[in-house]
From Swiss-Prot:
Stretches assigned to coiled coil: none
Biological function: Catalyzes the conversion of cobalt-precorrin-8 to cobyrinate.
Entry's Gene Ontology molecular function annotations: cobalt-precorrin-8 methylmutase activity; precorrin-8X methylmutase activity
Enzyme Commission no: 5.4.99.60
Organism: Salmonella typhimurium (strain LT2 / SGSC1412 / ATCC 700720)
Family statement drawn from the similarity comment of this UniProt entry: Belongs to the CobH/CbiC family.
Substrates-to-products reaction catalysed: Co-precorrin-8X = cob(II)yrinate
Claim: Electron transport is one of the keywords in the record: no
EC class of the enzyme, as a word: isomerase
UniProt protein name: Cobalt-precorrin-8 methylmutase
Metabolic or biological pathway, per its Swiss-Prot or TrEMBL entry: Cofactor biosynthesis; adenosylcobalamin biosynthesis; cob(II)yrinate a,c-diamide from sirohydrochlorin (anaerobic route): step 9/10
Length: 210
């Protein structure tokens, strides 16, 4: 049985196919910048879903501010271990950054039980309370985490808000688009931890090549 086995070749061929399909099916589509293109194509590569051409929203200064945050030592807080696992932490570390996910932290479990809230909400509360200045929040699964962040009167370096689902997901992301945060958001129900990680990785790869 013959099939491609080299991961670099598989990825390169995938992106070629993605570019060809966009050119054939959306000949008038224009990306706002090379980084905008890289992010959307990486999300499509992750999901095999070309709807992302139209449903990934960026605040006016999101890409500039997210890149500025990532090129300095920062803390990325994720709502799931899946999102944390998908982020290229080795590359992030070259810029002095690290990832944290508190969803299973005993403090989070206790706070969620005591307050009658989701663990995702409690994890955001704990992350907000930490003293680090350069914070990024990356949400791919929990609308309640995104809602909780929006409830806090805080300044953060950026938000990737792409929780997936039918209850609160679209609403939480819509609220993000009206916030003051530098943000990338998925419009509608689609999203996921894999999408969240793909967006962060696209930003990191861009910085590596800059």
């Amino acid at each position: 049985m013959h099939y491609i086995q080299q991961p670099q070749t598989i990825e390169a061929n995938s992106f070629t196919i993605i570019s060809d399909i966009i050119r054939e099916t959306r000949p008038d589509y224009r990306f706002a910048s090379p980084l905008h293109e890289a992010i959307i194509k990486r999300v499509i590569h992750t999901t095999a879903d070309f709807d992302w051409l139209d449903i990934l929203w960026f605040s006016a200064d999101a890409l500039e501010q997210l890149c500025d945050a990532l090129r300095h030592p920062c803390i990325i807080y994720t709502d799931t271990t899946m999102a944390l696992s998908g982020i290229n932490k080795r590359l992030l570390a070259t810029f002095g950054g690290e990832c944290r996910c508190y969803i299973s932290d005993p403090r989070v479990v206790r706070a969620a039980q005591t307050q009658g809230i989701t663990r995702s909400m409690a994890a955001v509360d704990i992350a907000i309370a930490e003293e680090e200045k350069n914070k990024l929040f990356v949400f791919g699964n929990a609308p309640t985490a995104l809602f909780r962040l929006l409830e806090h009167n805080v300044t953060v370096s950026g938000v990737v808000g792409v929780p997936v689902g039918f209850v609160g997901a679209a609403e939480s992301k819509e609220a993000l688009t009206h916030s003051h945060f530098p943000a990338v958001a998925a419009l509608g129900r689609k999203g996921g931890s894999n999408v969240a990680a793909a967006i962060v990785n696209a930003l990191l790869y861009h910085l590596r090549e800059a």
